[in-house]
Amino acid sequence: MAKGKFERTKPHVNVGTIGHVDHGKTTLTAAITTVLTKKFGGEAKDYSQIDNAPEERARGITINTSHVEYETETRHYAHVDCPGHADYVKNMITGAAQMDGAILVVSAADGPMPQTREHILLARQVGVPYIIVFLNKADMVDDAELLELVEMEVRELLSKYDFPGDDTPIIKGSAKLALEGDQSDIGEPAIFRLAEALDTYIPTPERAVDGTFLMPVEDVFSISGRGTVVTGRVERGIVKVGDEIEIVGLKPTIKTTCTGVEMFRKLLDQGQAGDNVGVLLRGTKREEVERGQVLAKVGSIKPHTKFTAEIYVLGKDEGGRHTPFFNGYRPQFYFRTTDVTGAVELPAGTEMVMPGDNVSISVSLIAPIAMEEGLRFAIREGGRTVGAGVVAKIIE
């Protein structure tokens, strides 16, 4: 049977559930699809369908992730849920599932636990911009004061990691009761309150085409009589014929002008996010551009060599290293289309990093890369992926 046509009428937002093991992330995911489907249509998913998450690969790393979708009055949501803690770490660091906002699930009976804290920290490090809290298992707590105490703890924890704890929406409910169709305040109505919080608290994300122009350079050709053509896939924004643009990274930044855009051998007047194009550059020599640089709107992105990052190191069973690495480790960092060697500095007090760990590090690259916070990269040794990371903060 054919799947229903995807109606692109409502704005699209990516979200996901995060939080400690057994606090009810998957049950809540099932409850959201079940309750919202009754009102807005779509497909309900039960717990077992979500819990049996298929494997996918991102940046050479295998991750188990479940994807569900649902609609509210005003939006279409794609929602990710992961079965295990390690899958969350990998998912957030590789950006396999970019989240415009996260639903932090906290059991009202237990309060914040170690993974609650770790997921909030990860969300901060990898640039998840908004968190909404679902205080789950409210049916197991009779004491209103206890509920308030847990809520205060969660708000303090969010504030500690630079989220606006005092202004964060916290919805109290029971995913289990909602799933069973319970009509009390903590049953189905709690799911509708959560949906309303998603709709109002998470702003509609900027579409890629509305961003500032950026295109990673994949290949460079010289066409006699016409000049230099750079090919690649436009990551965001639009480039028009006649635009002044910059070539950034690896070498000193140079300005040039786009004198032509072609796609599938046809000349266009512009290329936009998602297009695989060739961009003709006026007066630029073939040897002035190379793979690993980017074409970008003038002044929009700068080259950097030093940054802090959150990384996940592949386990031995994932094809990663078999041994730990230490301070001064020098692998290659693969940004967009090229490898650059860099030296790793471990945080004070961390002796070594084992395969399977995630850790915050500082990196010094031997050549500058066009970089902004939130940029993803792979860590490689001789072409083999041994880890993944995301730029947390640029130092210089």
From Swiss-Prot:
<dbReference type="Pfam" id="PF00009">
    <property type="entry name" value="GTP_EFTU"/>
</dbReference>
<keyword id="KW-0378">Hydrolase</keyword>
<dbReference type="InterPro" id="IPR009001">
    <property type="entry name" value="Transl_elong_EF1A/Init_IF2_C"/>
</dbReference>
<keyword id="KW-0251">Elongation factor</keyword>
<comment type="subunit">
    <text>Monomer.</text>
</comment>
<dbReference type="InterPro" id="IPR041709">
    <property type="entry name" value="EF-Tu_GTP-bd"/>
</dbReference>
<keyword id="KW-0547">Nucleotide-binding</keyword>
<dbReference type="Pfam" id="PF03144">
    <property type="entry name" value="GTP_EFTU_D2"/>
</dbReference>
<feature type="region of interest" description="G1">
    <location>
        <begin position="19"/>
        <end position="26"/>
    </location>
</feature>
<feature type="region of interest" description="G4">
    <location>
        <begin position="136"/>
        <end position="139"/>
    </location>
</feature>
<dbReference type="GO" id="GO:0005525">
    <property type="term" value="F:GTP binding"/>
</dbReference>
<dbReference type="InterPro" id="IPR031157">
    <property type="entry name" value="G_TR_CS"/>
</dbReference>
<feature type="region of interest" description="G2">
    <location>
        <begin position="60"/>
        <end position="64"/>
    </location>
</feature>
<dbReference type="InterPro" id="IPR027417">
    <property type="entry name" value="P-loop_NTPase"/>
</dbReference>
<protein>
    <recommendedName>
        <fullName>Elongation factor Tu 2</fullName>
        <ecNumber>3.6.5.3</ecNumber>
    </recommendedName>
</protein>
<dbReference type="InterPro" id="IPR033720">
    <property type="entry name" value="EFTU_2"/>
</dbReference>
<dbReference type="GO" id="GO:0005829">
    <property type="term" value="C:cytosol"/>
</dbReference>
<feature type="region of interest" description="G3">
    <location>
        <begin position="81"/>
        <end position="84"/>
    </location>
</feature>
<feature type="binding site">
    <location>
        <begin position="81"/>
        <end position="85"/>
    </location>
    <ligand>
        <name>GTP</name>
    </ligand>
</feature>
<dbReference type="GO" id="GO:0003746">
    <property type="term" value="F:translation elongation factor activity"/>
</dbReference>
<dbReference type="InterPro" id="IPR005225">
    <property type="entry name" value="Small_GTP-bd"/>
</dbReference>
<feature type="binding site">
    <location>
        <begin position="136"/>
        <end position="139"/>
    </location>
    <ligand>
        <name>GTP</name>
    </ligand>
</feature>
<feature type="region of interest" description="G5">
    <location>
        <begin position="174"/>
        <end position="176"/>
    </location>
</feature>
<feature type="binding site">
    <location>
        <position position="26"/>
    </location>
    <ligand>
        <name>Mg(2+)</name>
    </ligand>
</feature>
<feature type="domain" description="tr-type G">
    <location>
        <begin position="10"/>
        <end position="206"/>
    </location>
</feature>
<dbReference type="GO" id="GO:0097216">
    <property type="term" value="F:guanosine tetraphosphate binding"/>
</dbReference>
<dbReference type="InterPro" id="IPR000795">
    <property type="entry name" value="T_Tr_GTP-bd_dom"/>
</dbReference>
<keyword id="KW-0460">Magnesium</keyword>
<comment type="function">
    <text>GTP hydrolase that promotes the GTP-dependent binding of aminoacyl-tRNA to the A-site of ribosomes during protein biosynthesis.</text>
</comment>
<dbReference type="InterPro" id="IPR050055">
    <property type="entry name" value="EF-Tu_GTPase"/>
</dbReference>
<keyword id="KW-0648">Protein biosynthesis</keyword>
<dbReference type="InterPro" id="IPR004160">
    <property type="entry name" value="Transl_elong_EFTu/EF1A_C"/>
</dbReference>
<comment type="similarity">
    <text>Belongs to the TRAFAC class translation factor GTPase superfamily. Classic translation factor GTPase family. EF-Tu/EF-1A subfamily.</text>
</comment>
<dbReference type="GO" id="GO:0003924">
    <property type="term" value="F:GTPase activity"/>
</dbReference>
<keyword id="KW-0963">Cytoplasm</keyword>
<dbReference type="InterPro" id="IPR004541">
    <property type="entry name" value="Transl_elong_EFTu/EF1A_bac/org"/>
</dbReference>
<keyword id="KW-0479">Metal-binding</keyword>
<keyword id="KW-0342">GTP-binding</keyword>
<feature type="binding site">
    <location>
        <begin position="19"/>
        <end position="26"/>
    </location>
    <ligand>
        <name>GTP</name>
    </ligand>
</feature>
<dbReference type="InterPro" id="IPR009000">
    <property type="entry name" value="Transl_B-barrel_sf"/>
</dbReference>
<dbReference type="InterPro" id="IPR004161">
    <property type="entry name" value="EFTu-like_2"/>
</dbReference>
<dbReference type="Pfam" id="PF03143">
    <property type="entry name" value="GTP_EFTU_D3"/>
</dbReference>
